[in-house]
Amino acid sequence: LRHAQIGYNYRITEFQAAIALAQIENINEIVFWRKKSGKLITELLEATDFFKIQATPDYIEHSFWCVGARLKRDLKTWYKFRDYLFEKCGERLFGAWQVPYNEPVMQNGDFRRYLDSENNRIEYSKGLCPNAEEIQKEMMVFKTKYRNQESLDNFINGLEKTIKEFK
């Protein structure tokens, strides 16, 4: 099962803390590459007629943890696009597994043991957010993890080839 239970153990080991500290010390470079990657990916996807990108208002500066895009085609095409992209550049993209309240841990009610009695009556059922449930099936999530021009170019070239194949 995916996400079979919820845990609230937020402690980390010294090793994990050292990794986190190193990441924080490099935050400016990490964010620089995420923004650069995100902008390039967004431009490519927006130039097609089969992707819809969530709008970012002008007053917000996007940090691009990822680029989420809705593929306006059927599920069969979703899988073909994903596989073709991997073939062209060796990179995988993600899909939205399902909306969080449809995860097994929410559906089986195990999370309730962490709630006080007032919040224990909350119900999560399919159909709660029909728009999110519909969009979830069409989402492609593109990573922005690239930390140098060579790896970014590899992905962008693969994405360009994949888009041309599906036009």
Where are these regions (language model features)?
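PLP-dependent aminotransferase class I/II
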Residues: 1-167
